[in-house]
């Protein structure tokens, strides 16, 4: 009787290509040294990426690490819940609820235009006083372990869509912050408020930003947006928002930096805090990565 390890290595690799990554990494890699070495072979992860459509042969973009590329692609999705108002205001924290409060309406809405993606059916709309809502994304809870984020620091792509009513002016604002485990702000994107004049074309506009080469230690992402109308009309005449997204890209930092020393006093979401209060990074990279890979 032939033992499985007596099979040619190319046959074993072919078998591994068809095994789901969580089982491959959590279980198969621990069987023996031969399996561990084969599972770490670059060609295995390149072929798995091709097989699952993460990469095509005619794609010219270079890949630094095929194993990490595959893992990031398998995790990739919108980390914001209920981005298109399909569940009313569920999953959103209401930070400001001025005027007649937040409301959900169906596209295109009064004095509005259709959305570029016809799969999007609804939007959130603000009123005559400030309306703000937010979500705090816990990266560890979403499958992005500390070792993955700190060692490779994949790009974080943030997008939002906003539109005014044609008959009323309004202002829109967006704030995105990358924070540590104890909510120290490590990087932020907060562009100046956008003002739309009355009698505009009411077209939907995309606001986007990519965080690259940010400091290690990112554990949370705060996403907050909203606004109000500029004419103080009763009802819902402020900016409309929908299809918001936070996506962790497969693109990673080329030269991960050493651990960063925080300044004496640092910005914390909602307050200020001494650097000595922050937690230290823990964990062995590969063990943590294998154990935390999403099913």
UniProtKB/Swiss-Prot annotation:
Q: In which tissues is it expressed?
A: Present in liver and kidney (at protein level). Widely expressed.
Q: Tell me where it resides.
A: Cytoplasm
Alphabetical list of InterPro entries matching this protein: F-box-assoc_dom (IPR007397), F-box-like_dom_sf (IPR036047), F-box_dom (IPR001810), F-box_only (IPR039752), Galactose-bd-like_sf (IPR008979)
* Residues passing through the membrane, by range: none
Question: The FBA domain covers which part of the protein?
Answer: 69-250
Q: Which SMART domains match?
A: FBA, FBOX
Q: Which residues carry this modification: Phosphothreonine?
A: 280
Q: Name one GO cellular component term.
A: SCF ubiquitin ligase complex
Q: Where, per the database record, does this protein carry Phosphoserine? A: 249, 276
MF term (GO), any: carbohydrate binding
The record's listing under Pfam families reads: F-box-like, FBA
Its UniProt pathway annotation is:
Protein modification; protein ubiquitination
- Write out the entry's keywords from A to Z: Cytoplasm, DNA damage, DNA repair, Phosphoprotein, Ubl conjugation pathway, Unfolded protein response
Which intervals hold domain F-box? 1-48
Q: Which GO terms describe its biological process?
A: DNA repair; ERAD pathway; glycoprotein catabolic process; protein ubiquitination; response to unfolded protein; SCF-dependent proteasomal ubiquitin-dependent protein catabolic process; ubiquitin-dependent protein catabolic process
The protein's job, in short, is: Substrate-recognition component of some SCF (SKP1-CUL1-F-box protein)-type E3 ubiquitin ligase complexes. Involved in DNA damage response by specifically recognizing activated CHEK1 (phosphorylated on 'Ser-345'), promoting its ubiquitination and degradation. Ubiquitination of CHEK1 is required to ensure that activated CHEK1 does not accumulate as cells progress through S phase, or when replication forks encounter transient impediments during normal DNA replication.
State how it assembles.
Interacts with CHEK1 and CUL1. Part of a SCF (SKP1-cullin-F-box) protein ligase complex. Interacts with VCP.
| Name under which the protein is recorded | F-box only protein 6
């Amino acid at each position: 009787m032939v033992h499985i390890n007596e099979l040619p290595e190319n046959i074993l690799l072919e078998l591994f290509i068809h095994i789901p990554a969580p089982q491959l990494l959590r279980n198969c890699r621990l069987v023996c040294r031969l399996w561990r070495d084969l599972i770490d072979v670059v060609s295995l992860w390149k072929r798995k990426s091709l097989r699952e459509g993460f990469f095509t042969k005619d794609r010219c973009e270079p890949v630094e690490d095929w194993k990490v590329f595959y893992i990031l692609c398998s995790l990739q999705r919108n980390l914001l819940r209920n981005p298109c108002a399909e569940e009313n205001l569920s999953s959103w924290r209401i930070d400001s609820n001025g005027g007649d409060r937040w409301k959900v309406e169906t596209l295109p809405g009064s004095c509005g235009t259709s959305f570029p993606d016809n799969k999007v059916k609804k939007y959130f709309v603000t009123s005559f006083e400030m309306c703000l809502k937010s979500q705090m994304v816990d990266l560890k809870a979403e499958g992005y372990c500390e070792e993955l984020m700190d060692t490779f620091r994949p790009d974080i792509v943030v997008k939002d869509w906003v539109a005014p009513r044609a008959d009323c002016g309004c202002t829109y604002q967006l704030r995105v912050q990358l924070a540590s485990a104890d909510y120290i702000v490590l990087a932020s994107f907060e562009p100046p408020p956008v003002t739309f004049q009355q009698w505009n074309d009411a077209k939907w506009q995309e606001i986007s930003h990519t965080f690259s080469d940010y400091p290690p230690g990112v554990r949370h992402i705060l996403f907050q947006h909203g606004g109000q109308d500029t004419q103080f009309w009763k009802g819902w005449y402020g900016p409309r928002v929908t299809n918001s997204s936070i996506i962790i890209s497969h693109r990673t930092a080329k030269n991960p930096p050493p651990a960063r020393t925080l300044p004496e006093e640092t910005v914390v979401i909602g307050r200020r805090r001494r650097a000595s209060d922050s937690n230290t990074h823990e964990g062995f990279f590969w063990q943590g990565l294998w154990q935390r890979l999403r099913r």
